[in-house]
Amino acid sequence: MIKYITYDDIDKSKWDSCIRSSVNGMIYAYSWYLDIACSKWDGLVEDDYKSVMPLPRGEKYGFLYTYQPPFSQQHGVFSTSKITNEKVKEFLKGIPAKYKYVELSLNTFNRPTEDSFETSEGVTHLLDLISPYDTLQ
């Protein structure tokens, strides 16, 4: 089950452990990096930090919104298990309605198929270092 958790209630050691163990872990999702890149952030958490999704938070004219912080190329769902389109859709639908505007750059493992979200594709160059060196050559 996916739960919305405010910054003060996030267990940062479990959060960082999830990022470290996830198939698609990136520096941009570690709690210490989020603390530097954005002044406020909350998160969506599945079960006991099996999967997480950071929600950088801003407020303008009394409206809450989530955004892509500077120097953070990719966010989205990070998981210790396989990331399916269904899981990404569940996380996106789990963003609370109090966020009136959402603009996030999802990571390369997140492929939303839900028509109710407006999406655009960008180009990135990513070398997956999970493969052995001989394969990467």
Named regions from a protein language model:
Residues 1-6, 10, 114-137:
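Acyltransferase donor/substrate-recognition loop-hinge adjacent to the catalytic core
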Residues 17, 32-90:
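Conserved donor-binding loop and adjoining core beta-sheet/short helix segment
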Residues 84-124:
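Non-catalytic accessory segments adjacent to catalytic cores
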